[in-house]
A protein has these predicted regions:
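Low-complexity, acidic interaction segments enriched in glycine
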Residues: 4-12, 17, 21-29, 33-46, ...
Length: 160
């Protein structure tokens, strides 16, 4: 119901950045990451918006199931930004996202070889698929979101 009310407010006050921000925040709370990112991007374009909104969509999308969307958003921001700090941040984020994509692909290879997804990332080394695990240069360490899950066991994320 909160989202519905906020959307009504947005229709009445289309230039108020706080309203799409709060709509996005509410979507974030119910794990609808694509919708949350859409509203954060919308808020970022409005007058007076806080600077963090411009790049927050990349972080939000990285929490969802499709890292490709986060990569595409980071690449879009990198290509369109004239601010060196944003450029540097997006380069770092892209490396981080692509490392997670790499690990997800390696997890799929693991499943082909072993018949299941790994319970721990270290199993990728133990089974000779990788010689070492990549370092998480941006966050606090990569982890499996659903260790051993038959369908989603490939998913890798990082907290930062």
């Amino acid at each position: 119901r909160a989202i519905e009310l906020l959307k009504e407010a947005e229709a009445r006050l289309p230039d108020e950045w706080r309203i799409p921000y709060w709509i996005g925040f509410n979507y974030l709370q119910i794990n609808e990451y694509e919708k949350a990112a859409t509203y954060y991007k919308k808020a970022a374009k409005l007058p007076g918006a806080l600077p963090f909104l411009e790049t927050s969509s990349v972080h939000i999308l990285s929490r969802g199931e499709n890292l490709s969307m986060a990569v595409a958003e980071a690449e879009r921001l990198l290509a369109s930004s004239k601010d060196q700090d944003t450029i540097d941040l997006m380069k770092l984020r892209l490396d981080w996202l692509k490392t997670m994509q790499f690990l997800e692909n390696v997890n799929r290879d693991f499943k082909k070889k072993v018949g299941r997804y790994p319970q721990r990332l270290q199993e990728l080394v133990e089974h000779g698929i990788l010689t070492t695990l990549p370092r998480d240069e941006f966050g606090e360490g990569f982890y499996l979101v659903y260790p051993g899950d038959f369908d989603k066991g490939y998913m890798v994320r990082s907290n930062f």
